[in-house]
A protein has these predicted regions:
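Residue(s) in the substrate-gating loop at a strand-loop-helix junction
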Residues: 143
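Short C-terminal tail/terminal secondary-structure segment
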Residues: 94-97, 148, 228, 239-252
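Alpha-helical segment proximal to the catalytic Tyr-Lys
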Residues: 128, 173-174, 236
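Active-site helix of classical SDR
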Residues: 123, 160, 168
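Short, small/polar-rich loop/turn modules that mediate ligand/substrate recognition or access, typified
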Residues: 176, 181, 238-240
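Substrate-binding pocket helix/loop in short-chain dehydrogenase/reductase
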Residues: 98-100, 104-110, 208
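Canonical Rossmann dinucleotide-binding motif of NAD(H)/NADP(H)-dependent dehydrogenases/reductases
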Residues: 3-34
Length: 252
């Protein structure tokens, strides 16, 4: 018996990396998965792989900055399966770090649109469906950058992830009465393409890893297992919380 048997899950940013692993894991745990991204070719391949493994999944085009795309994605979940139980706001971007006075307003707006506005829009459109289903679980992927560790963080990225952290707590407080839980996950350095693109300077990356007590990057599987826990009924008394997965970096 899977941890998500009978559940319907919607995942953003699911075409590759952590999002794809979430889609695959959730399907393996018995969920009926709807997942979206803007990388349609890669998303279709993930969809095919899940189905080949015996899981149930459908890919949809989802630009998280477009409200109409969210309406369609939630509509796909409820139209196909009659309900929505889980939302994973996974989609996010990072841009190369520059001093604040060199960052353009357009770059800032783009990061905030994907990372923060996308979480708001997904949550906004998931809540009515979850309310009709009698409750649900929303998991927002933030970052340790949203809590601290500011020295080497890109300013727009850190601000967007901090916004997610507080938005999560407000959502949890406002919708506990609807049976909707909302929690955030805060990974530190994780071995993904996005992390490596954020730290092209290998010397800087090495120095950052030296400050992690466990002495290594995290893995996608380690983050996905935490997301699965928060999505499942095993975490039924947890809401408004932040789960840090950083090898002990913030504990120093």
């Amino acid at each position: 018996m899977g941890k998500l048997d009978g559940k319907v899950a919607l995942i953003s940013g699911g075409a590759r990396g952590q999002g794809a692993a979430e889609a695959e894991t959730f399907a393996r745990e018995g969920a009926r998965v709807v997942f979206g991204d803007v990388r349609d070719g890669e998303g279709r391949k993930v969809e095919a792989a899940i189905r080949a493994a015996g899981g149930e999944a459908v890919y949809v085009h989802l630009d998280v900055t477009r409200e109409a795309d969210w309406e369609a994605a939630v509509g796909t979940a409820t139209g196909r399966h009659g309900r929505l139980d889980i939302l994973i706001n996974n989609a996010g971007i990072v841009i190369p770090r520059v001093p604040i006075d060199e960052r353009t307003a357009e770059e800032w707006d783009r990061v905030m649109a994907v990372n923060a506005k996308g979480v708001f829009l997904g949550t906004k459109h998931a809540i009515p469906a979850m309310r009709r289903a009698g409750g649900g679980s929303i998991v927002n992927i933030s970052s340790v950058a949203g809590i601290g560790q500011s020295l080497h963080q890109e300013p727009a990225y850190a601000a967007s992830k901090g916004a997610i952290r507080i938005f999560t707590k407000v959502t949890a407080s406002q919708h506990a009465g609807d049976g909707i839980r909302c929690n955030s996950v805060h990974p530190g350095p994780v071995d993904t393409e996005m992390f490596h693109s954020a730290f092209p300077d290998k010397a800087l990356m090495a120095r950052r890893l030296q400050r992690i007590p466990l002495g290594r990057m995290g893995t996608v599987a380690e983050v996905v297992s935490a997301v699965l826990y928060l999505a499942s009924d095993e975490s039924s008394y947890i809401t408004g919380s932040e789960l840090v997965i950083d090898g002990g970096a913030l504990a120093q």
